[in-house]
Amino acid sequence: MKIAVVGIGVAGGYLLSRLKNEHEVIGYERMKEENHDSICAWGTSANEMRELCKKSEINFDDFIIHHGKDMHIDMNNNERFDIKLKGLVTFDKIGLIKKMAEGVKIHYGVTPKLEELEKEFDMIIDCTGFYRSYLPKIEKDFFLPTYQYKIQYDGKIPIDDFFVKPFSKMTGY
C-alpha cells in the first residue's frame, strides 16, 4: 500500500517508523528541513515511550535528556508546592523524530493539496495536530494555552526540574 503521512512530529514520525517496513511510505512536512521543530510536550512518560519505541526497534533511553525528580508548582495565590515524579523525562524530540523517519523520503517545506495526494496514495494520514490540515475541525474543541521555554545557559543548570505556573483563573499554564 502507498501511504502519505502529513505532519512529521512525534505522531507522524512514529507512524513512519511502524509502516516503513511493510508499505511504501512518504512523509510531508510544512516546515523546511533546516527549520523543522516540534513544539510542545518535551516532557513525557519514560515507561510508555520505551514501550512504543521498542515496537520500532528504537531505544528511547538514547534520547532522554533529563529524568524529573520534582515538579514545582507556583500557584497564582502565592501557594507553592512540589510533586514527586516517577518516570517523567524530557527528551531530544527532534532527534527521536529523525530516528523514527530514517530511510523514509520526506518532502519538507510543502503542504500538498488533498486532491493531489488522493491521486497518488492509497491512504493519507493527517498527523498535523490541532491544525487538522485535512480533517474537519472539531466542534467545541478545547485548547489549553501554554508557554514553554528552552533555557540557554552557561555553566551550572539554573533550574534542574519541571516548573509549572498556571495562568490566573486556571485558563492555561
Language-model segments: residues:
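Extreme N-terminal starter segment of soluble prokaryotic enzymes
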Residues: 1-4
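Predominantly flavin-linked oxidoreductase catalytic cores and closely associated redox partners
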Residues: 8, 98-173
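Short, glycine/charged-enriched secondary-structure capping and boundary segments
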Residues: 19-20, 40-43, 138-141
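Hydrophobic packing residues within well-ordered alpha-helices of enzyme cores
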Residues: 19, 52, 134-135
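A conserved beta-strand/loop capping segment in the N-terminal third of enzymes
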Residues: 44-98
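Gly/Ser/Thr-rich beta-alpha loop segments that engage phosphate groups in nucleotides
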Residues: 9-14, 43-45, 131
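Glycine-rich FAD pyrophosphate-binding loop
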Residues: 6-8, 14-39
